[in-house]
Amino acid sequence: MAHRPPSPALASVLLALLLSGAARAAEIVGGHEAQPHSRPYMASLQMRGNPGSHFCGGTLIHPSFVLTAAHCLRDIPQRLVNVVLGAHNVRTQEPTQQHFSVAQVFLNNYDAENKLNDVLLIQLSSPANLSASVATVQLPQQDQPVPHGTQCLAMGWGRVGAHDPPAQVLQELNVTVVTFFCRPHNICTFVPRRKAGICFGDSGGPLICDGIIQGIDSFVIWGCATRLFPDFFTRVALYVDWIRSTLRRVEAKGRP
């Protein structure tokens, strides 16, 4: 018998109950190593003074700005954060890497309890030097839809299994956009027929669909790659006007 998704009303009730068991999203389970430096927009957030201490991902959307999840810096002072660009192996000092402190951060009404507006802009201490290993990614149009069935790519440096150590090199995973159990503020993904998905330790990383960042790793329900529930990403297209307005405002302040 074919699987039938729950009705929208029932799905909303079930999701509200399940959110109490939601956990920060993070690692890539069931993926594979990315080709070195093939995702030049990928950022690693680390603890300052502790090289290799990756705790969240991010995405370079402008030479001076990285997009990540708001919950990544909820309990960490920004002065303790080191942003690393151009990395493939986060445990080594690669010649392609560029390191930055955080100049300031911008939130958009983050609601931690309901896991809404899980988006944060980091202004880097100085503009990145763009190269083959460090490049920006394209933003979607405001409110651009991502249809059910769209094929996308999730990535990160988190654990590759619930009981495995964090990955040293960037991992990526092909995922499918789904609508069951999802909410309007999120994009949800699923990997059919096998145990794979995002998990703990690498929130903030991007969901890339057709070369465009459409999502930010946000949370999972009842553990990693359960094959029962989709993975939840912040829907970037809802925040494009806010992102562009913030960038314009910061750039205007910097003009003489």
UniProtKB/Swiss-Prot annotation:
One of its GO terms (biological process) is collagen catabolic process. Disulfide bonds join 56-72, 152-209, 182-188, 199-224. Residues 28-248 form the Peptidase S1 domain. Residues 1-25 form the signal peptide. It is found in: Cytoplasmic granule; Secreted; Cell membrane; Membrane raft. Residues 26-27, 249-256 form a propeptide. Its EC number is 3.4.21.76. It catalyses: Hydrolysis of proteins, including elastin, by preferential cleavage: -Ala-|-Xaa- > -Val-|-Xaa-. Expressed in polymorphonuclear leukocytes (at protein level). Expressed in neutrophils (at protein level). Expressed in differentiating neutrophils. Glycans are attached at residues 129, 174. SMART domains: Tryp_SPc. The active site is at 71 (charge relay system), 118 (charge relay system), 203 (charge relay system). It holds the Pfam family Trypsin. Inhibited by phenylmethanesulfonyl fluoride (PMSF) and diisopropyl fluorophosphate (DFP). GO terms for cellular component: azurophil granule lumen; cytosol; extracellular exosome; extracellular region; extracellular space; intracellular membrane-bounded organelle; plasma membrane; plasma membrane raft. Serine protease that degrades elastin, fibronectin, laminin, vitronectin, and collagen types I, III, and IV (in vitro). By cleaving and activating receptor F2RL1/PAR-2, enhances endothelial cell barrier function and thus vascular integrity during neutrophil transendothelial migration. Plays a role in neutrophil transendothelial migration, probably when associated with CD177. Triggers inflammatory processes in neutrophils by interacting with ADGRG3 upstream of F2RL1/PAR2 activation. It is linked to Is the major autoantigen in anti-neutrophil cytoplasmic autoantibody (ANCA)-associated vasculitis (Wegener's granulomatosis). This complex, systemic disease is characterized by granulomatous inflammation with necrotizing lesions in the respiratory tract, glomerulonephritis, vasculitis, and anti-neutrophil cytoplasmic autoantibodies detected in patient sera. PRTN3 causes emphysema when administered by tracheal insufflation to hamsters. May form dimers. Interacts with CD177; the interaction tethers PRTN3 to the cell surface; the interaction is direct. Interacts with SERPINB1. Interacts with ADGRG3. Belongs to the peptidase S1 family. Elastase subfamily. This is Myeloblastin. It comes from Homo sapiens (Human). The lineage of its organism: Eukaryota, Metazoa, Chordata, Craniata, Vertebrata. The gene is PRTN3.
